[in-house]
Amino acid sequence: RDRLSIGPVVFNEHLFYFKEILPDEKIRVSFELAALSKDGTFFEFEHNYYNEKGENLARCEMSGGWINLKSRKLTSLPNDILKKFQTSNKTSSFKEISSKDTRRWNREPRDLD
């Protein structure tokens, strides 16, 4: 990460719990790509949490982007990393997104008076 001077920034994250996860319970966490912009700047990931029986205990849906750690500005992914994401596991509803999709929740800051 430091070598490339890029890092992830999370825009939003939704966590849905289906069953209790105990502190000492062994779980498996999956990764699926739910969306990706053409140049890889923006992404949506889906993580599913499973117990040893394969029961889906929780799901995390998150969206974000990649920033240049020096300029602190959004940046596209290098081609070799972009290709890895493009060939990774995808959700059945995978889609290509743009910067407009990152604002779909229509949330605005509310400053203190």
Kindly give the residue locations of the regions a language model identified:
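HotDog/MaoC-like acyl-thioester-processing domains
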Residues: 17, 21-26, 34-112
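Short, basic/aromatic beta-hairpin or loop at an interaction surface
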Residues: 1-8
